[in-house]
Amino acid sequence: MKTLFADLAGDLDGEPDHGTPLVLLHGLTFDRTMWRPALAALAELDPGRQVLTLDLPGHGGSPAWPSYDLESLAQAVYRGVGEAGLQPPVLAGHSIAAVIATIYAARYPASGVVNVDQPLQVEPFVRLVKSLAGPLRGPGFAQVWEQFEASMGIGLLPPAAQELLQSSRYVRQDLVTGYWREAIDRPADELATMTADGLAAVRDAKVPYLVVAGHDAGPEYLSWLNQMLPQASVTVWPGSGHFPHLAQPRRFAGVLADTAGWPETSR
């Protein structure tokens, strides 16, 4: 069923009595179609599972906003989940949407988070985008974005997955800098404190948390993550770049299927 869920374009499929519902959130500059290969496999592995896929504001069929902050984006997803009539869901978010999913789990009832290739330690990324603020907001945007895109490992994906991403790209300067505004403009220590507070809320609520990464983040990051979010587990799929859900869609569908019994979180 295709419709709008609190002004977010989306698809709602499955039945409410087939395990914990799923909410899938795409990464920046893409749209909800990126989940199609995994959803096709999920229909075989976990038939009838209730799944809501949403286009984030400014992507796909969802209208643009004058500005984007992550708290408001999480709130928009929460409104969409409510309008869809879902029980507390497991949220799977790719890239920046994993941050949105994590904020959701810190603020609203959630049954779990599947983080697709998004580090949660904000300082390295914040330092990087602050150093590139001028080109990002000026005529050098296209060149800078090419560098970011080159680091994603799209060429590691099967040809069909590469074509899917190319067909769903929404690379606009105002969109990228809008979603990155807080990282560019707000002090790094302030963002680090916000992250720590959010992770503390997820930790205290004992929300199940799984990271599916395309590369090993290293022992220092894993030690930090274990301290901040002890219940988080990390699985690395080497050679899948920034898109492990597209590199191995059936394996990722298995990950989603395994969340069917994740417990609800009372709040």
Question: What positions do the PLM features span?
Answer:
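Conserved alpha/beta-hydrolase catalytic His-Asp/Glu region
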Residues: 124-126, 142-202
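Catalytic histidine-centered segment of alpha/beta-hydrolase-like enzymes
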Residues: 237-253
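Flexible "cap/lid" loop of the alpha/beta hydrolase fold
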Residues: 102-106, 110-145
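Active-site loop/oxyanion-hole signature of alpha/beta-hydrolase fold enzymes
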Residues: 2-11, 50-92, 96, 254-257
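The conserved beta1-alpha1 loop
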Residues: 25-27, 94, 213
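Conserved catalytic-core motifs of eukaryotic protein kinase domains, centered on the activation segment
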Residues: 34-36, 62-68, 125-127, 222-223
